[in-house]
Amino acid sequence: MATILVLHGPNLNLLGTREPEIYGATTLADINSTLTEMCIAKGHHLQALQSNAEYELINRIHDAKGEGINFIIINPAAFTHTSVALRDALAAVDIPFIECHLSNVHTREAFRHHSYFSDLAQGVICGFGAQSYELALQAAFAKLDS
């Protein structure tokens, strides 16, 4: 049994109401519920945290190492393009992770095209709405099984 940590960055608490034409109508609670069900079906455990505060995400990543977290899925949201500190935290704990985005960041504003995480990630999944998380979790299962 593996434990997978899902981290949701800033403003993702507003999913379902924030710019649904970009992010869809699915809520964060819906996403977490689906991911939990997927983990249970595979015999794994899921933990999730959403924070608008960079330091809370960093502290959670630091704690993950000591807790034996096996894999991280992270949607850094706006921190994707700005947070060297969050990148450094992921590098420091050396837990494999997948970067995940609801929208296709490469078809949006130019400032969203750069990620501080992609070169460290096992992979990047973007552009499939809430399904991006499900695809990331399926990829995490495959990595854990290999």
Curated annotation (Swiss-Prot):
Q: Matching PROSITE patterns, A to Z?
A: DEHYDROQUINASE_II (PS01029)
Active-site annotation: Y23 (proton acceptor), H101 (proton donor)
- Its EC top class is lyase
Pathway per its UniProt entry is:
Metabolic intermediate biosynthesis; chorismate biosynthesis; chorismate from D-erythrose 4-phosphate and phosphoenolpyruvate: step 3/7
Q: Which residues bind substrate?
A: N75, H81, D88, L102, S103, R112
**Keywords for the protein's UniProt record, in alphabetical order:** Amino-acid biosynthesis, Aromatic amino acid biosynthesis, Lyase
- Gene Ontology MF annotations: 3-dehydroquinate dehydratase activity
Q: Where is this site: Transition state stabilizer?
A: R18
Q: Which domain of life is it from?
A: Bacteria
Subunit info here reads: Homododecamer.
Q: Which family does it belong to?
A: Belongs to the type-II 3-dehydroquinase family.
Q: What name goes with this protein?
A: 3-dehydroquinate dehydratase
Q: Which organism is it from?
A: Saccharophagus degradans (strain 2-40 / ATCC 43961 / DSM 17024)
Q: What is the lineage of its organism?
A: Bacteria, Pseudomonadati, Pseudomonadota, Gammaproteobacteria, Cellvibrionales
